[in-house]
Amino acid sequence: MAINVSTNVSAMTAQRYLNNAADGTQKSMERLSSGYKINSARDDAAGLQISNRLTSQSRGLDMAVRNANDGISIAQTAEGAMNETTNILQRMRDLSLQSANGSNSSSERQAIQEEVSALNDELNRIAETTSFGGNKLLNGSFGNKSFQIGADSGEAVMLSMSDMRSDTKAMGGKSYVATNGKAPDWSVTNATDLTLSYTDKQGEAREVTINAKAGDDLEEVATYINGQNGDIKASVGDEGKLQLFAANQKVSSDVTIGGGLGTEIGFAAGKDVTVKDINVTTVGGSQEAVALIDGALKAVDSQRASLGAFQNRFGHAISNLDNINENVNASRSRIKDTDYARETTQMTKSQILQQASTSVLAQAKQSPSAALSLLG
């Protein structure tokens, strides 16, 4: 090997390996201190893109879980308020049955009516004041709202809430009252058939036909009607008037009353009534109130069932989102996170090489001095 002083190739080689070892040590320290093996695009351009997409998906899933939990909280708030609405309606029903009893005087019925009116006011207060995050839930203003329960746009679920005030259509129905009352000794004679034609809530045409027997009184006619169907309730009110009630939760059309017996009794046109209109100061009003409240309870129960299903659905959605998020983060970790066992081994190797290169470089720098000995 030639000896020269102008170019020290050995030192240059040692310097190059020393720089490589120093870079390796620096890179290992960066990865160990940051916890990531990809800290810039030069580390792994493709891996950086994939990990960033997975990070976006993971953050979207985290927000989706939060949104779903907010949706559950809203449903729980509304369902809790409707539970109290149910309790109020049950109490109003009890009072209506109490008022329908013949042992009550007019003053006693008036006292019962005062409590019914107070309960009605509280029912409306609950509907008007129940809110979540500034949004009213039960006064009809909530409408339909979407809940984003996915990591990407378009992955939303709709929630709707009905108006739970006592004057809404869902909390009422139509009342049909005979135009003329029957005397206490009235009974069925020749005309024995009565038909009720209507469309139910599912949109199917229905017809109920009863065939009374000669000698049956008005109470027995009402019993026949109630026994033949579950949609229209019959009762006998004041002054011997047969009255029918069709809840909007069960019947979606007007009720057409026909047949010979129906014509003989004679009914006025249907009148829209709601829980707000309950009047238990009369026997007829008390009887009608029971049927009316039964329809209102069905409306509340239907909404509560919908909210229960909504909560269960979101509970399953959260479980699925958590599972997806776990797998996404595991994939991102494999791509981006530092393997400390491997990296500490690599850093130790780089440090040893750095020390060796430093020693070799020091020796290589002494090579040109050999030329001096040749000069004597």
From Swiss-Prot:
One CC-aspect GO term: extracellular region
Alphabetized SUPFAM superfamilies for the sequence: Phase 1 flagellin
Protein's cellular compartments: Secreted; Bacterial flagellum
One of the GO BP terms on file: positive regulation of gene expression
Keywords for this protein: Bacterial flagellum, Coiled coil, Secreted
Coiled-coil parts of chain: 103-130
Record carries keyword Oxidoreductase: no
A Pfam family hit: Flagellin_C
InterPro entries in the record: Flagellin, Flagellin_C, Flagellin_C_sub2, Flagellin_hook_IN_motif, Flagellin_N
GO MF annotation list: structural molecule activity
Functional note: Flagellin is the subunit protein which polymerizes to form the filaments of bacterial flagella. FlaB is not essential for flagellar synthesis and motility.
Subunit structure: Heteromer of multiple flagellin subunits including FlaA, FlaB, FlaC, FlaD and possibly FlaE.
Family under the similarity heading: Belongs to the bacterial flagellin family.
The protein's name in its UniProt record: Flagellin B
Organism (species): Vibrio anguillarum (Listonella anguillarum)
Lineage of producing organism: Bacteria, Pseudomonadati, Pseudomonadota, Gammaproteobacteria, Vibrionales
